[in-house]
Amino acid sequence: MTREPHRLSRRTLLKQGMGIFGLLAGGLMSSSSLAEILKEPTPRQSLGPFFPDEGDPIDAIRENHAIGLPISQANDQDLTYVKGRRGKAKGQVIYLKGKVLSAKTGKAIPHTVIIMWSASASGRYNHKKDDGMLKFPHPTTGEIIHRTYDAYFQYWGRAVSNEQGDYWFKTIVPGFYPIDLEAGQYRPSHLHFQLFPPEHPKLVTQLYFRGDQIPNNELNQKLLPMDVVILDAGLTTIDLERVIVDYAPDASGEILDGLVGHYDFLAPN
């Protein structure tokens, strides 16, 4: 069933300061419509060509050498360094925190395996297929950007939600990169995810960035509505809003080495 583009997600309502009860009281939305919105799963998007399957990475980073464990699940959830290497990943550090919930019931889903992967801060993947356009001019400033491999960036990681459905990752903001310079097409900064919620279908999606301290934030916001992956997935304006995460300094003051974003995955039924 095609989603209606005028529908508002819970996250959008809260961001606009409208409030759920205000919508109900003001007659802008029926209780049945609200219930339907709160049950919409996280929008699906493509896996992409750079998932870390065995034999694909340029550098086969494997922190966990357990027999039978796929390389995509062999690294921890802190991607800002590689165990055994003296150095830190380049780029703006971020923390992504949230829960894995059932879209149908709203209940937490523990023991969900979450695989996350992305490009480096300069927009280069640890993947043999990512071998083109290794330098390009910034579309706004004209500065030449070199898409370089970062030996201190982990590139992919694995988290498992706890009994309350909580998960977290620590990583860097990946760079945007060109997919067709002549057509002026670029992929905005994004994180890839593959989730395996117990007793639920697998979820594959991507999350995007927004925030005053996010590198190339203004450019990323311009690129998002015309992104080929978003368009191919058939995301509406509201769907897109649901997969953009706002990042800012930690309001509690506990996290001092990076920006913090929050996102709850809603697993399909």
Positions of PLM-derived features:
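N-terminal secretory signal peptides
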Residues: 1-12, 21-22, 26-27
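Compositionally biased, intrinsically disordered low-complexity segments enriched
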Residues: 8, 18, 194-196
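Peripheral, solvent-exposed domain-edge segments
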Residues: 16, 250-251, 268
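Beta-strand-dominated extracellular/periplasmic modules and repeats
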Residues: 34-244, 256, 260-268
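Short amphipathic beta-strand and strand-loop transition segments with alternating hydrophobic
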Residues: 245-253
